[in-house]
């Protein structure tokens, strides 16, 4: 390389770094795990002609840093990541774009145009359809927890209202965590009102499920992924974000309880009396799991063509969990781990059939296994302590069991995917080098 670079070469290099950072920003803000962000950025860098040995990428939750250096010249650029959400379609399309750009010799203008198209693409579902999906997802939870179909309907209505309230709060610029608390408050208040309708044989179940659309399943599983992949700093930030979301949800529920004097109807006692043993057939639980999985798929903006796939995944996860838990007697923790791991193992192969990232299929499929009854037992027990012997033990037991189930769900999703990535990484790298060599032969590859 010459010792000096012309202004035109510097401008071209900075444009490449800008495109690289904008790609990474879209991935981070769409809730991609850090390993996927780095892999995609390295692939895009290869397309841009930025050698991996000269490229340095640092990913954090709120900032991306890219540096390219050859010993004589060094250029760095920063990109803030602020508008975090969940957009599985964007994650999938960026992965495809990174390969397509190499195979089809995209110009920088073509790549930028495609990137902008992905960024500005309308979501697959309009807001009210997403809210309906969120409502039915929580209704599915209610049915999985043992509620009847009337309780399913009440839960769906309450969750729909809470979801729309949260969306409106976000539109008005209200703090993210405060929006969650307000949504949980509204959902719980409406569920409380449904107690007095007298139309359901399981009137307390809507209180268990009406706010579960807030469950931070994607941040939780990304946290486990990042920690296992040794992205400790990002993983810790995701964990803190997850805890804050759960605390905000709990805060809203607690306020609702105090405002409506829920303790006067002894709801905490009712929750402790709810059975953890399924009373319905596997068919009913399969239907409820499919509804819940598809509802969360809409929240995560998964392509319509994959809804049935995720529904099947939810059925497999829940039925496997119930079989291992109740038929084999291994308990809910091992049952949840096996349910999520079976889905993740199937997804390792299914990603090649449907051409989407692993998490697009696995995360919505395992969400229906969230232990809502145990979570609410722990929450209600904690805030209604009166110094009676055994209260602390019950709260800690329920809390630890719920936490272990959630952790095992996340591990069951993450571990098979991580091991599979390591096995196929060499094949992907070899394929990438073959495609780059073809570009060189076509005279389209220009290295910095």
Language-model-detected regions and their locations in the chain:
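Short juxtamembrane and helix-loop transition motifs at transmembrane-helix boundaries
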Residues: 109-122, 135-147, 163-174, 263-277, ...
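Soluble N-terminal domains of membrane-associated systems
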Residues: 1-113, 117
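Structural signature of hydrophobic alpha-helical transmembrane segments
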Residues: 142-158, 203-216, 270-289, 329-341, ...
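C-terminal transmembrane helix-loop-helix hairpin of multi-pass membrane proteins
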Residues: 206-210, 222-226, 230-247, 282, ...
